[in-house]
Amino acid sequence: MKFICERDTIMKEISVAQEIISSKNSMSILSNVLLDAREETLTIRATDLRVSFETRIPVEVVNAGTTTVFCEKLLGILRSLPSGDVEFELGEGNSFSINPVFKKINFELKGIESDKFPEIQLASEDQYFELSQAAFIDMISQTIFAV
């Protein structure tokens, strides 16, 4: 797997994924985020088995593939990098490298095979409903918080 994307774009989505992940997981794989690169799109997934997050961002896919990496470390590395394009590559032995394009910086993380990542359960169609933005805002404005 190899893909290139803009640092700020992926960092924003990884930040949201990190909020989903609990700091005290019973399974170590739940501290990871799943990255699936194919057809010029990167799918990012995170779960704590109760709440799940999935998003897609446009990327330049050189080689399609999938892996999972420790979300907190990935986010820390992304925050330390300068803005611009970043190359992500999965190498031998699930070694996941992160390299800013045109910079001589190289980070490596150990990935875990994606087949160990739990499947995200989707709600059935009958559990969804549509709500206008105005109605939603009106309901939120009528909410009272008690302490």
Give the predicted meaning of each segment:
Residues M1-V147:
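Structural preference for solvent-exposed beta-strand-turn elements
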